[in-house]
Amino acid sequence: MYIDDYKRWLSADLEDPALTDELRKIEGLDNEIKERFAVALKFGTAGLRGILGAGSNRMNIYVVRQATQGLANWVKTQGGSQLVAISYDSRINSDVFARNAACVLAANGIRVRIYDALMPVPALSFATRYYKANAGIMITASHNPAKYNGYKAYGPDGCQMTDDAAAVVYAEIQKTDILTGAEMMSFEDGIARGLIEYVGEDCKEALYSAIEACAVRPGICKTAGLKLVYSPLNGSGLVPVTRVLHDIGIDDITIVPEQQYPDGNFPLSLIHISEPTRPEPIS
C-alpha cells in the first residue's frame, strides 16, 4: 500500500520540486519509503507536527492543504463569522504553509485574517478572539528541532481545539485526498476577492494594550533603571517583545545579535533547537 502511495507521489506533478527530488533520491529504499508513507501524520487537539519532507508522514504543502480542507469542512458547520485567523513563526516553510492554508480556506468561501509577518502563538490566540473567528491556525513546531514544523488548530476561544472538534476535523481530513482533495485559490485571488485580509493594526495595538494592562504596578519600570539582555532565539518574539518592553519604559535592552533575527535553522544552537528551558540554545 505505501509503495503505491509513493509511486503516486513520484509520478505526480508536484508544485514543490524539492519534494520530487527527495522522492527520487529514496527510490528503491524501502525503509525510507515506508517511513514517509506507511502512516500519515495524525491530527489531534495539538494539530499536526512532523519532520519536513515528502509523504503523508511528513510536513509539506499537501499535508497542510489536506488538514485545512478538513478544518474548513468543520468551520462550515459552525455558523458564526465563517472566519479563520492565521499566524506563523520563523520555522522553515512556515510562511509558505500559512499562505497555503489561507488559500484553501478562501477557496471554501471562508474569510481569512493572516498576519503580514511572523508573530508568536499568543498573537494568533488574540487575533482569533479579536475577530470572533471560528478557528485559528498557527504554523509552528514549538520547541522541536529545526527539521520539524507543525500545524496547530485553535477554537473560537483562542485555546487549543477541543477533543470533540479535533475528532470531527480528523474525520474530514481522512475523507480528503492528500494530493487533489483540497479546494485551492491563489493567494492573490483571495486578496482581490476580499476573502483574505491581513491582520489590521487595530488588532496588533489591541494586543499590546491588553498585555500592558496586565502590569501589577503600572509605571514602575519607567523609574526602575532596568537593564535587560534579551534573545528571541531566532524566533518570532523580536518585534512584539521589544515593543512591549519599550512601551512599559524599559529602553536599555541588549539583544543577542546572533539570535536577533528569524532563522528556522536556529544556527547558534549546536542541536538546532529553540527551547529556552534547555541550556544549549542560550549557552
Regions found by a protein language model. Give the residues of each.
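Single conserved hydrophobic/aromatic residue that forms the stacking wall/gate
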Residues: 271-275, 279-283
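N-terminal small/polar loop signature for handling phosphorylated ligands or for N-terminal nucleophile
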Residues: 85-148, 244-270, 274
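Short, glycine-/Ser/Thr-/acidic-enriched flexible segments
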Residues: 48-50, 55-57, 91, 119, ...
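Polybasic, low-complexity association/targeting segments
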Residues: 1-4
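Gly/Ser/Thr-enriched, mixed-charge loops and adjacent short helices
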Residues: 32-37, 41, 149-270, 274
